[in-house]
Amino acid sequence: MALAPELSRQTKLKEVAGIPLQAPTVDNWSQIQTFKAKPDDLLICTYPKSGTTWIQEIVDMIEQNGDVEKCQRTIIQHRHPFIEWARPPQPSGVDKANAMPAPRILRTHLPTQLLPPSFWTNNCKFLYVARNAKDCMVSYYHFYRMSQVLPDPGTWNEYFETFINGKVSWGSWFDHVKGWWEIRDRYQILFLFYEDMKRDPKREIQKVMQFMGKNLDEEVVDKIVLETSFEKMKENPMTNRSTVPKSVLDQSISPFMRKGTVGDWKNHFTVAQNDRFDEIYKQKMGGTSLNFCMEL
């Protein structure tokens, strides 16, 4: 599949209300903002590289009552429409969501202020997963390297500056996570931490199950824990993005499912970068009650 010139590696991000986004998304913004959510929609919300595919597979396994075969019905990106996704002439995320029967499970990377207003007015359920900023930064760097529809990230040192300044696609990690955290009690939001999911997947999966209004036997929950492990998902063609053309995601540069660990940032950050990041983190996150685990 050849990429149109405007989707070449040199693609520049555009902005909506100061938030950098991929150009086709911005060009399709009016359709995204007027999207009509339904009261029984469940929206999976994450900052990029925070366990989106993982939580999607968990939610789908719960929805399908642990039936692995049903979860193999199609690739994961087709099961839960990505509402801000746009790649003309293909159907947009909104088009795919509109064609889906209720109840719908959808996904987004949008910060709270850019979410289509109908999600709030319909009091939808939101499932948010947050990952510590350092690991998120590293994982996003490798994704930027292999993604052929994002700008070239440059060197790690260059990308470090881009990330801390919020100039990556979907904007600042700090603002994104804080935004969702601050409204968690005002709406139907289940706020989970990637690190908790790694530490005790069964407990966190049970939280998701209860949030979805499902009641599955313990043996089914144990099966879901096994089937949604990183090792299983990395080998699963329905979740590992191996079907995505190399012209979009070049997994010879870096695999889509790379490590899935906590603390990999220590293999990338210099001492000086870590000290600087900690200082910036204190400034930006000092006023919140958010606490992240940086290593297990």
Curated annotation (Swiss-Prot):
Keywords recorded for this protein, A-Z: Cytoplasm, Lysosome, Mitochondrion, Phosphoprotein, Transferase
Residue positions binding substrate: 107-109
One Gene Ontology molecular-function label: aryl sulfotransferase activity
One GO BP annotation of this record: sulfation
EC number: 2.8.2.1
GO cellular component: cytoplasm; lysosome; mitochondrion
Induction: Down-regulated in kidney but not in stomach following feeding with 2-amino-4,5-diphenylthiazole.
Major subcellular site: cytoplasm
Binding site for 3'-phosphoadenylyl sulfate: 49-54, 131, 139, 194, 228-233, 256-260
Annotated function: Sulfotransferase that utilizes 3'-phospho-5'-adenylyl sulfate (PAPS) to catalyze the sulfate conjugation of phenolic compounds. Does not transfer sulfate to steroids, dopamine, acetaminophen, or alpha-naphthol. Except in mitochondria, where it can add sulfate to cholesterol producing cholesterol sulfate, which alters mitochondrial membrane organization, and impacts protein complex mobility increasing state-III respiration, thereby modulating mitochondrial respiration.
Name of the protein in its database record: Sulfotransferase 1C2
